[in-house]
């Protein structure tokens, strides 16, 4: 094993949050070496899985993300046009866009940032990180995809931007023969069309009323209207549809309410007074699971379904093994500071997080608590807490 690489920080993950952290660290630590660890360096899950998804973020906010720190602006100004940035400027700024535009923007920023001599790029996964508390130093072990050797990096700061994946719950009816559809597949029309058989009647159970659930319904309805005329959908939901509302200078249900294409589809076709008469209503049967009716509803309706897709949120991806002075460490995230504490409530030195796995907790003027997920929301959070991380 070669000698450990010494750096000012280690950033794990190269999705939108990891990229934002790298940009902020390069801006605030000029001349310092920053280690960046990721298996792909291809803009994370948003690029791998969600390129065909319509965003619930306005184009102008993607632009604000891309110009938020000087290292990003330098990349934009030195990238030959046409490029992902110039393409973004031609879109309608006050509307959403398909996420492939945002993913390509992140890939272009990543490509430019990786050219910096101040970035130590390591293509692989972190397997273990141990804090030497008296030295305030993390020793980070990395399984490199580019060499057979384990790589080690030593740094006073370890920032986890490790992402999340769709939540999987147990099938509500035991021993039921039903095929799971991955939410990521249902959100990708080009893949969904191949995932469901066309030659016989098929019924897909969609669980949830989130933004992802509504987009899943939209994609399945589009399929039923075109290539899969025998497809039907049973929509299991406990909650009324909830929409983001633009208030005076802020957004009610900014992180939990429907926006954009999903909101338009829901308002026009899925509301209780619209569904029976709408185009979507030709294919969708809504199953009310509210007020304790959930178990009975599943038992009555799920056995007639051939497939099930659960759109019930996202679960943090597994973290690398963490230790302090060789002893296993259980880390609890602080959604205010971006730091972590141990099982006894003690602050863990130099350990931080951001992104969908570790979002900021926000409270709106009506005292509603939400967790801020989105490109520019990650950037705002990181810009707020990064000075504190570097001063600690």
UniProtKB/Swiss-Prot annotation:
Gene3D superfamilies: FAD/NAD(P)-binding domain (3.50.50.60). Keywords: Glycoprotein, Oxidoreductase, Signal. Disruption phenotype: Does not affect the production of agnestins. Residues 1-20 form the signal peptide. The keyword Oxidoreductase applies. Its EC number is 1.-.-.-. Glycans are attached at residue 134. It is an enzyme of class 1 (oxidoreductase). The keyword Glycoprotein applies. It comes from the Eukaryota. GO terms for molecular function: oxidoreductase activity. PANTHER family: FAD_NAD(P)-BINDING DOMAIN-CONTAINING PROTEIN, PYR_REDOX_2 DOMAIN-CONTAINING PROTEIN. Monooxygenase; part of the gene cluster that mediates the biosynthesis of agnestins, dihydroxy-xanthone metabolites. The pathway begins with the assembly and cyclization of atrochrysone thioester by the non-reducing polyketide synthase Agnpks1. The atrochrysone carboxyl ACP thioesterase AgnL7 then breaks the thioester bond and releases the atrochrysone carboxylic acid as the first enzyme-free intermediate. This is Monooxygenase AgnR1. It comes from Paecilomyces divaricatus (Penicillium divaricatum).
